[in-house]
Amino acid sequence: MTQLSEPVPVSLAARRSLWQRVARVWPYFSGSRAGWALAIGATIVASATEPFVPALLKPLLDRGFQRDSFNLWLVPLALMLLFTVRGLSGFLAQFALAKVTNDGLLKLRGAMFDKLLSARLTLFADQSSSAIANTVVYEVFNGSSMLINAIMKLARDVLTLLALIGYLVYLNWKLMLVVALLFPAVAFVIQVLSKRLYRLTKESQTATDDLAYVVEENVMAHRDVRLHGAQAGQASRFNHLSNSLRRLSMKSTAAYAGMSAITQVLAAMALSAVISIALLQSAENTTTVGGFVAFVTAMLLLIAPVKSLSDAATPVTRGLAALERGLDLMNLTPDESGGSFVKARAHGDIEFADVSVIYKADAAAALDQFSLSIKAGETLAIVGASGSGKTTLVNLLPRFVEMSSGNIYLDGQDLRAWNLASLRAQFAFVSQHVVMLNNSIAVNVALGQPVDRARVTECLAAANLSGLLAELPGGIDTILGHNAMQLSGGQRQRLAIARALYKNAPILVLDEATSALDTESELAVQEAIKRLTASRTSLVIAHRLSTVQHADRIIMMEAGRMIESGTHAELLARNGAYAHLYRLGFRNT
């Protein structure tokens, strides 16, 4: 199976430092300077309020209960003001953070989708559609939310720690030395367990892709699975992958929980030491009750940010791992490359010169030193057994497949010299595998071009779809739904023919385009195709005699080579491979 999670080895990604990994995603989230400024400013204010809680306790305990020595009413008023400022700052920081996250997510998703539209087509052969969709839609959303929130929480906790530590040093620098011993140990725990979390996160991404792919396969093949009674096998496959994902999730939870538990134990050890030393100091009258309570309170307030810092490794690690999948999709997938030659409308002369295509190093050539010249306006029929190279041949023309060697020329210009957009504008494709967008009939027919309603209706009529339009209340504005599945196979294929008619390209490729049509529909569509091919270069792959017998020329292919060429009558008279195929039933298939 294919999947998306393999572009960068985990070991290579793990060798990058935390700051190197953050630097990779920073350009997408750095645009909203006002948002960052507001979030950081509000975070600083919220963090600075933390030491005021124990600071209010000290005078209250030392002097507050002595008559006329301290105004007790100042304490509740100060607390109200303190928590009002704190709450408002938290709200502003969260709102600004949401803006930063969503702006960055919009930018990152846009860049990823642009990459999907411009990437080499090997991307879609190497990776499953579920893995790509999971990365673009879910991974970057979860990753950006986790990472940005974790970074700001990290900043808030660090600032809170600094504020509290400053207050602790002011209160009792000797006790603070004991607390300081906690930080190296916590840092060591975070460093060790973060590496494990990163590895487990990458493995979980792969397992999630595998599971999503099984679901995707069973949705697409639901009829075949039921027809062949394969439910038990597919359920076993799904359960095996689900259990693998569950085990990885439990390992991640154990690492996360272990990090939190160890940090709390270290904090408890430090607190116990502080209390012991404070008791010794109180015997020497160097520590007041208020000072001791304020110190312990401030130290207890330290536990939350320290624990949070230990927990921050999990969302930061997971967020970075998720976002790096999107970055790897963009950075490690090369774009399609084209030349600069542009022509508004090609004449239609095509030449293949010693073209070979080898998909895998250890596999036989799909095309083997293939040479052929096609004149402008000629209708060429291509026949041959399955796997003979017919579809590979026509997919070379718009560069959906790249040749391994040789040259292909359109109007005397090497295909690689053509601008890709200009090159592909010269071709209209109709294949047996029809893909329609979840949009209106009009938009699907005019795909990539402005919608001319009269022209759309004309093309639909030429493709024998007038009857269907009359049955639809919305006419050409009817939404087709997922791949137009409410239409029959023949109707979808005729819709693809209408799309080709609308494009009005100088070169037409029909890849078994009438294979799903009934006899009545085929006769109507054949007439439309005959009109369509009258002034165009046409390449027709078909298994039906009616599709090829009127072609100007027929070529017979076998194992990536052309073994015969001529008209239908000439090839029958030659009594070779084509005549043999014809006698085996080609005329009836």
Curated annotation (Swiss-Prot):
Catalytic activity: ATP + H2O + lipid A-core oligosaccharideSide 1 = ADP + phosphate + lipid A-core oligosaccharideSide 2
Start and end residues of each ABC transporter domain: 350-584
Domain of life of the native organism: Bacteria
Keywords: ATP-binding, Cell inner membrane, Cell membrane, Lipid transport, Membrane, Nucleotide-binding, Translocase, Transmembrane, Transmembrane helix, Transport
Disulfide bonding pattern of the chain: none
Binding site for ATP: G384, A385, S386, G387, S388, G389, K390, T391
InterPro entries: AAA+_ATPase, ABC1_TM_dom, ABC1_TM_sf, ABC_transporter-like_ATP-bd, ABC_transporter-like_CS, ABC_transpr_lipidA, P-loop_NTPase, Type_1_exporter
Compartments, as annotated in UniProt: Cell inner membrane
Recorded topology in the membrane: Multi-pass membrane protein
Pfam families: ABC_membrane (PF00664), ABC_tran (PF00005)
Location of the ABC transmembrane type-1 domain: 37-318
Free-text note regarding domains: In MsbA the ATP-binding domain (NBD) and the transmembrane domain (TMD) are fused.
UniProt xrefs under NCBIfam families: MsbA_lipidA
Family membership noted in the UniProt record: Belongs to the ABC transporter superfamily. Lipid exporter (TC 3.A.1.106) family.
Listed name of the protein: ATP-dependent lipid A-core flippase
